[in-house]
Amino acid sequence: MPTPTKGARLGGSPAHERLLLANLATALFEHGGITTTEAKAKRLRPYAERLVTFAKRGDLHARRRVMRHVRDNSVVHTLFTEIGPRYANRDGGYTRIIKLGNRKGDNAPLARIELVEALTVGQQAVGEAERARGTRFSERRKPTGATAEAAEDLASESPTAAAVAAQSAEEQAPVEETLTAQAAETSAATVEETDDDGPAESKS
């Protein structure tokens, strides 16, 4: 038995809700973005992203699973030939929801749900370089030797990744100089305290 969804049901019956989500997903894949109520957009988001995941697989079984929900053959073709390959390097997060305010008349909150853009070559190179140098991506996935080598190759090929690597080196250099200066000051202060204590003990 399927787990019931919390909150009010869209439409009136379960069958009406399934048809409503299928039609909204078809319109989303056909036009790239639609404007609807905020409640429908939030319910549509996981529904549509699951269909995009099937499209990324690209096999016959995945196509048949999608055609259970999307009945328009042209939209299914677009989903498997254009939308699915677009997100080959993105693990989830294929849509975004933008709130638009309330609608005149019934004051219902409106929102626009749309497909996000694909990752560019520069963004992929920057992501690989950041994983290799162990910054904000290191908590999620630590780079292997192959990933580090690939990031270095991408940095040599991509000017964006090279700029990121240069900026990282510039940020690390002042930190090392500051630590060296602090260590020198600490040692000098220790020597002065020793010199001050020495004569006092000899007088006593």
UniProtKB/Swiss-Prot annotation:
* Key word Ribosomal protein present: yes
Named from the GO MF annotations, one term is: structural constituent of ribosome
Compositionally biased intervals (Low complexity): 156-191
The annotated region (Disordered) lies at 124-204
What's the superkingdom here? Bacteria
Bias class Basic and acidic residues marks the residues at 128-142
Does Transmembrane appear among the keywords?
no
Q: Which GO terms describe its cellular component?
A: cytosolic large ribosomal subunit
Q: Which InterPro entries match?
A: Ribosomal_bL17, Ribosomal_bL17_CS, Ribosomal_bL17_sf
Q: Keywords in alphabetical order, please.
A: Ribonucleoprotein, Ribosomal protein
The Acidic residues compositionally biased stretches are: 192-204
Q: Which GO annotations describe the biological process of this protein? A: translation
Q: Which NCBIfam families match?
A: L17
Q: How does it assemble?
A: Part of the 50S ribosomal subunit. Contacts protein L32.
Family under the similarity heading:
Belongs to the bacterial ribosomal protein bL17 family.
This chain belongs to which protein, by name? Answer: Large ribosomal subunit protein bL17
User: Source taxonomy lineage?
Assistant: Bacteria, Bacillati, Actinomycetota, Actinomycetes, Frankiales
